Amino acid sequence: MNIKSLLLGSAAALVAASGAQAADAIVAPEPEAVEYVRVCDAYGAGYFYIPGTETCLRVHGYVRYDVKGGDDVYSGTDRKGWDKSARFALRVSTGSETELGTLKTFTELRFNYSASNSREDGYYGTNSDGTVMQFAYIQLGGLRVGIDESEFQTFTGYLGDVINDDVISAGTYRTGKISYTFTGGNGFSAVIALEQGGDNDGGYTPVFKDSQGREINGRGYQIDGYMPDVVGGLKYAGGWGSIAGVVAYDSVIEEWATKVRGDVNITDQFSVWLQGAYSSAATPDQNYGQWGGDWAVWGGLKYQATQKAAFNLQAAHDDWGKTAVTANVAYELVPGFTITPEVSYTKFSNEWKRELGNDTLDDAWGGIVRFQRSF
């Protein structure tokens, strides 16, 4: 056997061995394509598609810390020291398109903490904390069901951009409800709502009494039977501003209340608003007309002084003679982080002194600084 024959034989053996190994080899499957989270811009900034679905999700909220001093401008009592409170609000929003319209949900969970020095001796304070499901509703097109704020409060718009905005309360806040909002293409909108009644998430806490004049603890503003509270409203909005009105029927006390509000954009930086209200019950111990007496009026302005700083002013007065004035400057230190120093003044009338059970009340000055990070 010569060298040439030996080399040819060795090569043939190697080819045969390689073929046998290839026949025994396991073929690995191709890796699946990675599905990255997609941005969803159909419902605003911050939404993304939940993988494997056409539902868009947004996680947002805020963290805030408040420091208060001076008098409590709601009750008129002297704080005797600093009051501190903190809140973490976690919000989750979803949205998707269906054959019946846009399907949305919104939830907000609040974690609260507060520490107070408001004892008469000013020496010992009190602490409290708690967690609450503030909002949880489903919306399909214009139909909304769940826990939300009353249309009597939101349809006309909130009061001014101040922290102590409801020293003279303009109505209840959180409630269970079924509502329908019609939005036209020409700036007009209308709403009708059936509501369970509020839980007094506002500024004034009423004192309910039985037929013998004894105080009833733990009662809120909820309905006491099958008949719901009813709210209806109309609004027109344009580039110049808006005008809106609402009327509400309180099924518990069988009385009604109404509000009308106008907003005007003087310039891109300067806007003003005015709101008037009337209640047939003439008492704050109710779900909607929580001001004193028959009527109340609120007004305010906002001036965007710079890109970072805004000045806000609000004044209010009711039929019982209470006057409340608040002013602040909201300064955005960096995007998403705002510091707001605010000062408030309240003048109490004789009727409010009797309502609050404190004949020594006269006026109250209070201040607050809010630190808030929104995301």
Curated annotation (Swiss-Prot):
One biological process term in Gene Ontology: monoatomic ion transport
Subunit (UniProt): Homotrimer.
Membrane listed as a keyword: yes
Keyword Transferase attached: no
Membrane topology of the entry: Multi-pass membrane protein
Protein family according to the UniProt entry: Belongs to the alphaproteobacteria porin family.
Species: Brucella suis
Protein keywords: Cell outer membrane, Ion transport, Membrane, Porin, Signal, Transmembrane, Transmembrane beta strand, Transport
Leftover remarks: The pore formed by Omp2a is larger than the one formed by Omp2b. Omp2b pores have optimal permeability to allow growth and protection against harmful compounds. The larger pore formed by Omp2a may be advantageous for intracellular growth, when the bacterium is competing with the host cell for nutrients whose concentration is particularly low within the phagosome.
Signal peptide range: 1-22
Description of its domains: Consists of 16-stranded beta-barrel sheets, with large surface-exposed loops, that form a transmembrane pore at the center of each barrel. The pore is partially ocluded by a peptide loop that folds into the pore lumen.
Function: Forms passive diffusion pores that allow small molecular weight hydrophilic materials across the outer membrane.
Protein name: Porin Omp2b
Resulting phenotype, residue 258 to A: In strain: 686, De12, Fr7, Fr11, Pt1, Thomsen and Wf21
Domain of life: Bacteria
Subcellular location: Cell outer membrane
InterPro entries: Porin_alphabac
GO cellular component, one term: cell outer membrane
Gene Ontology MF annotations: porin activity
